[in-house]
Regions:
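Signature of N-terminal electron-transfer/Fe-S-associated modules in redox systems
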Residues: 1-150
Length: 150
């Protein structure tokens, strides 16, 4: 079946199977920034934005994005690069596998809250798992980024 949607503001049409997940479709079509870490919608590595809301693409049937706007890290590259600098400064990016998910979550957080509280930040990032480092470094980096990126 054909699937038509907007990928980073560009209309695309892909051939998909009805039971295919969005992460699979994106990766098959060259969007390798969408990582598949757990394949169970539990780690956040496959996070994308669908109509500006974060979703775990390894658990979302691709057909559900028909006509919608899907944003990957390529669609927020400048913001993601700035956040990556903060992660590096805090030692929060040892392997960077989780970084894409964090970048998209932080983008969504900025859209939702003008001045997020510590609890709101923690609530947003809770689904992003990192096996390399403690979450305090990510939290510190995100907090500094949000404060200075206004």
């Amino acid at each position: 079946m054909k699937l038509k949607f907007y990928l980073n503001d560009v209309e695309v049409t892909y051939d998909i199977q009805p039971d295919e997940y969005l992460a699979q479709v994106l990766r098959r079509n060259g969007v390798l920034s969408v990582h598949i870490g757990c394949n169970e919608s539990a780690c956040g590595s496959c996070t994308v934005l669908v109509d500006e809301k974060p979703v775990l693409s390894c658990g979302l049937l691709a057909a559900k994005v028909e006509g919608k706007h899907v944003t990957t890290v390529e669609g927020i590259q400048e913001e993601a690069n700035k956040l990556a600098d903060y992660f590096a400064d805090e030692g929060a990016d040892q392997c960077s596998f989780c970084g894409v998910g964090f970048a998209l979550i932080v983008h969504a957080l900025r859209k939702e809250y003008k001045n997020p509280t510590d609890e709101q930040i923690k609530d947003f990032i809770v689904g992003n798992l990192c096996r390399c480092s403690g979450y305090q470094s990510q939290f510190n980096a995100i907090k500094k980024y949000l404060k200075e990126a206004k």
